[in-house]
């Protein structure tokens, strides 16, 4: 399969440079503004994170309880510049807000085992299609976690369900090589 050739990875930097000339200016400007605190979206999130961290100084052990109602009840006392926010705009901060630092440790350990098991299975796997599926399972969760650094999507139950379903599918793909193959019964 052409797309699984390691030599094609050498083309990645060239493709990234080509994106600069292909993407619309609005997209390029948005990427350029990510680290700029003068950008309203970036400064908004930074202020929310600062307020959330101030709140977690008092509620780090057990959190404030799940849901946006609990967050909206407690957060305004800690918010910077009077910024109103429905959630922490960061998955990891929101987990600590909802259930405390122990929940965050459990979540991070779960993710560690997920990535470790899938990467180990990828190294053992000989079937190129299985390797492709394992790569997709790792990439899907990794991409979600990168996005989760600047937003909290679990308030949407469809996204929450898809996240856990994707984790379950990836875990199954990690253990697929250990399962006995069974033919169709006639």
Regions found by a protein language model. Give the residues of each.
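Hydrophobic transmembrane alpha-helices and their immediate junctions
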Residues: 1, 99-142
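Hydrophobic alpha-helical segments of polytopic membrane proteins
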Residues: 1-23
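Transmembrane alpha-helices of multi-pass inner-membrane enzymes
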Residues: 9-10, 14, 135-186
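Hydrophobic membrane-targeting signal helices
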Residues: 18-27, 111-114, 145, 150, ...
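Juxtamembrane transmembrane-helix termini
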Residues: 27, 32, 113-126, 154, ...
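Long extracytoplasmic/lumenal interhelical loops at the membrane interface
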Residues: 36-50, 58, 62-99, 122
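Membrane-interface micro-motifs in multi-pass membrane enzymes
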Residues: 67, 96-100, 155-163
């Amino acid at each position: 399969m052409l797309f699984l050739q390691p030599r094609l990875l050498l083309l990645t930097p060239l493709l990234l440079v080509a994106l600069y000339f292909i993407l619309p200016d609005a997209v390029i400007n948005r990427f350029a503004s990510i680290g700029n605190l003068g950008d309203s979206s970036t400064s908004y999130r930074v202020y929310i994170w600062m307020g959330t961290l101030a709140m977690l100084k008092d509620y780090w052990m057990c959190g404030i309880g799940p849901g946006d109602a609990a967050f909206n009840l407690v957060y305004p006392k800690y918010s910077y510049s009077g910024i109103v926010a429905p959630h922490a705009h960061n998955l990891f901060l929101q987990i600590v807000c909802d259930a405390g630092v122990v929940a965050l440790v459990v979540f991070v350990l779960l993710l560690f085992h997920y990535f470790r098991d899938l990467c180990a299975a990828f190294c053992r796997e000989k079937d190129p299609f299985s390797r492709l599926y394992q790569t997709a399972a790792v990439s899907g969760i990794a991409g979600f976690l990168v996005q989760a650094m600047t937003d909290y999507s679990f308030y949407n139950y469809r996204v929450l369900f898809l996240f856990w379903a994707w984790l379950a599918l990836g875990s199954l793909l990690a253990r697929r090589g250990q399962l006995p193959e069974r033919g169709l019964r006639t």
